[in-house]
């Protein structure tokens, strides 16, 4: 189920100071994750990551604050020196009307020029692709965790699964051994 994302404005009004509780100070810098791409780490070897802003319209932000988004099948491309996020699904805002956005429209990612140049060089090198790992709010602004990934072959996936099961079995055996000695 979708969770409702809420954020509190901690800014001070003009000339007046606003009292902050201890709870709001603790949560001021935390990430509020809206969506994650769980298949990305399974299907790709992650080589590098970046944090990018995203250009949105009002109803998209409202829909995201309700916790609704899907990163399935989404990817990023570089066209004319700009990074674009494609196939990100943000459903229409439930209380919107004729001003609602198109759910699967192409959205511009906001990065520094030197980051874009670096990404372009790495994508051109070989079988690399840009994939979003997560969408989250950071200090009230929506951010995208963008990753440079290389697609895994079937044998790579099998090796990863085998390695994880071996690690899991080793920790279980160690836990049983410790319990057997102490108990």
From Swiss-Prot:
Name of one Pfam family that matches: SmpB
Main localization category: cytoplasm
GO CC, alphabetical: cytosol
InterPro entries: SmpB, SsrA-bd_prot, SsrA-bd_prot_CS
A molecular-function term among this protein's GO annotations: RNA binding
Compositional bias (Basic residues): 13-27
Region (Disordered): 1-27
GO biological process, one term: trans-translation
Compartments reported by the entry: Cytoplasm
Keyword set, alphabetical order: Cytoplasm, RNA-binding
Record-stated family: Belongs to the SmpB family.
HAMAP family linked: SmpB
Stated role: Required for rescue of stalled ribosomes mediated by trans-translation. Binds to transfer-messenger RNA (tmRNA), required for stable association of tmRNA with ribosomes. tmRNA and SmpB together mimic tRNA shape, replacing the anticodon stem-loop with SmpB. tmRNA is encoded by the ssrA gene; the 2 termini fold to resemble tRNA(Ala) and it encodes a 'tag peptide', a short internal open reading frame. During trans-translation Ala-aminoacylated tmRNA acts like a tRNA, entering the A-site of stalled ribosomes, displacing the stalled mRNA.
Name by which UniProt lists this protein: SsrA-binding protein
Organism, as annotated: Corynebacterium kroppenstedtii (strain DSM 44385 / JCM 11950 / CIP 105744 / CCUG 35717)
Gene (UniProt): smpB
């Amino acid at each position: 189920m979708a969770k409702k994302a809420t954020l509190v404005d901690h800014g001070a009004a003009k000339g007046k100071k606003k009292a902050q509780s201890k709870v709001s100070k603790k949560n001021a810098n935390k990430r509020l994750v809206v969506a994650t791409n769980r298949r990305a780490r399974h299907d790709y070897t992650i080589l590098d990551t970046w944090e990018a802003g995203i250009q949105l319209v009002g109803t998209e932000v409202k829909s995201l604050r309700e916790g609704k988004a899907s990163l399935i099948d989404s990817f990023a491309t570089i066209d004319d020196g700009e990074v674009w996020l494609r196939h990100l699904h943000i459903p229409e805002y439930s209380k919107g009307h004729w001003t609602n956005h198109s759910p699967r429209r192409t959205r511009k990612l906001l990065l520094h020029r030197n980051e874009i140049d670096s990404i372009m060089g790495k994508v051109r090198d070989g079988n690399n692709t840009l994939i979003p790992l997560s969408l989250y709010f950071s200090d009230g602004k929506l951010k995208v965790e963008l990753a440079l990934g290389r697609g895994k072959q079937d044998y790579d996936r099998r090796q990863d699964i085998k390695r994880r099961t071996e690690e899991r079995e080793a920790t279980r055996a160690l836990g049983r051994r410790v319990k057997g000695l102490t108990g």
